[in-house]
Amino acid sequence: MTVSASRPRLLVLYHFFHPDRVVSARIFSDFAAEQAARGWDVTALTTNRSLDDEAVRYPAEETWNGVRIHRVFRPAWTQKRPVPRLGNSAWTLAAWFARAVQLGPFDAVVLGSDPSFAASLAIPLRAAWPRTPIIHWCLDVFPDAGEAEWTGATRLLSPPARAVMSAAYRCCDVVVDLGPCMRRRLEAYGGSPARETLTPWALVEPDAPAPADPAVRRELFGDAKLGLLYAGSMSRSHDFESLLALARACRARSGDDVAICFACTGTNLPVLKAAVRPDDTNIRFAAFADEAAIQRRFEAADFHLGSLRPDFTGIVVPSKFFAALAVGRPFIFAGAPDAAIATWTRELDVGFVLEPGGADDVAARLAALAHEPAQMQAARARAFAAYRSRFAKRIINDRWAALLARMRAGRPTPTG
């Protein structure tokens, strides 16, 4: 296959892709479609398995929004345990390399970070296409993300995994991170690739902040004057203890006027529910919503909550921050004060950073806002403006297009 003289060819690789609905799959699918609309001939390599149900298999090939999708076969091994997940990674990366060589050459390659160790594919791709720009868009840092849950014999994988990933990052022309903390982790692996920060965007981007639906707000927060929503995943990487401390500080100061609703799923949800006491009357739970209800819930809240354990700082970045700002809702982040979300929250004045021991201070600010609707409206306006000017899908994809154009201009056209 020869490279098109009229449209440069871009290869995008990610474990899950359209029509999967998980956030990262939709981000990579939208990215591929956006670059196709900007003039690239885009090929996506993914797998034939659904994230939600391994028994569901997608067609081997499909064209969607100008993107040619090629799905390699992957066994129906669970993604919920480390060893089968590593098996899925090894299988998928080997199948991808074989298919990529058949489909290539390309003018540029963008590698995601799923499956685990996906960036290691840069090593054989660099050998096969020494002059093709390889870009790694890192949504999760490996092996750091894996080490957080490896136990027993799997911990022995850490030294060789770090050696492999160090070699992989060195094979990339550009490593795209999600913020300064992630960049510092990636820089520790050595090498001298170019560095860029390009964040994900919100899946829903309304034209203006919408008022809350009274019925949805009552369902989530009862009669509270201020509603704080934690929506999404509650996994090992998330710190719910700080959020419980905030809820209790709010109740001590304002009674039930400030309510927190957890509408989430994940491995830590049962632990969170067990930690809630009978006197936590301003803490509520709601079932995890389907996509049709998510935007109404997001708009029903006054603030959105996010958390990240300090040891996960720089490994992942909570995407709910972007979703909250997109609907014009400020954010409260519980995590390390130097985390990217904390830095942006302070820099853009779009919420509060909940540091250890800081629950009373944030509770006092919330109590004041509960009686200051004009200030709350101003906070919403700042959040919405920050998203539109800094994190919107159009802006991020324009920056991606500029990066791809620069890389193509700096590399000869691949020949095989």
Describe the predicted segments one by one:
Residues A215, G357, D361, P373-A405:
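A charged, aromatic-enriched C-terminal amphipathic alpha-helix characteristic of glycosyltransferases
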Residues R162-R195, V204, W400:
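A short, active-site helix/loop in glycosyltransferases that binds the activated sugar's phosphate group
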Residues S120, P124-A128, R155-V175:
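Membrane-proximal helix-turn-helix segments that form the acceptor-binding/catalytic region
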Residues L220-H238, L243-R248:
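Conserved donor-binding/catalytic core segment of Leloir-type glycosyltransferases
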